């Protein structure tokens, strides 16, 4: 039972570390966003903390009573030092990049909605970079909410169509 528990913990720790890497290195290639903008602004910091705790947890789980005392002390201290890596990466580099995790949405306006599916809309999103507020970015996106917490957003160009299910929001 203990072995199953430790293997499950190791699996979750590795999953959080992979999630951190994919989110910050490849996250702009995915079109899934949080619908709650307040939570979305806190999520990178939560993910950084979970990754650091996961790295430290993997080192702690590597401590064995059969090892010599100095080896366990090295694992304990080394785990703490390696757990600082996500904090240093985020606060030293990622925090100052103007990527999707640093975009602050100033205004979001729905211009069309689908009369067949209420979860599909076309929005104009005005966002500004969280690090320097000088550059304002306007995007027209197709948004499809697939759970109460997530939505998919893809860039779209608006074209006039005769027979469409889209209705203009007034």
Model-predicted segments: where are they?
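Membrane-embedded alpha-helical segments of integral membrane proteins
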Residues: 11-63
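Alpha-helical transmembrane signal-anchor/signal-peptide segments
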Residues: 92-117
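Internal/C-terminal transmembrane anchor helices
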Residues: 68-97
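Membrane-interface helix-boundary motifs at transmembrane edges
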Residues: 1-6, 35, 61-75
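Alpha-helical transmembrane segments
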Residues: 4-15, 46-50, 73-80
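Extracytosolic and intramembrane catalytic regions of membrane-associated proteins
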Residues: 108-170
């Amino acid at each position: 039972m203990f072995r199953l528990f430790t293997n499950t913990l190791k699996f979750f720790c590795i999953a959080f570390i992979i999630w951190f890497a994919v989110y910050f290195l490849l996250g702009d290639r995915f079109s899934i966003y949080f619908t709650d903008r307040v939570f979305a602004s806190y999520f990178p910091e939560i993910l950084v903390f979970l990754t650091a705790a996961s790295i430290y947890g993997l080192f702690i789980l590597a401590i064995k009573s059969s090892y010599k005392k100095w080896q366990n002390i090295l694992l304990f201290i080394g785990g703490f030092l390696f757990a600082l890596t996500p904090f240093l990466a985020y606060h030293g580099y990622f925090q100052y990049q103007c990527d999707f995790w640093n975009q602050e949405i100033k205004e979001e306006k729905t211009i069309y909605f689908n009369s067949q599916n209420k979860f599909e809309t076309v929005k104009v999103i005005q966002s500004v970079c969280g690090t320097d507020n000088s550059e304002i970015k306007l995007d027209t996106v197709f948004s499809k909410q697939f759970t109460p917490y997530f939505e998919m957003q893809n860039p779209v160009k608006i074209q006039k169509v005769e027979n469409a299910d889209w209705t203009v929001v007034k």
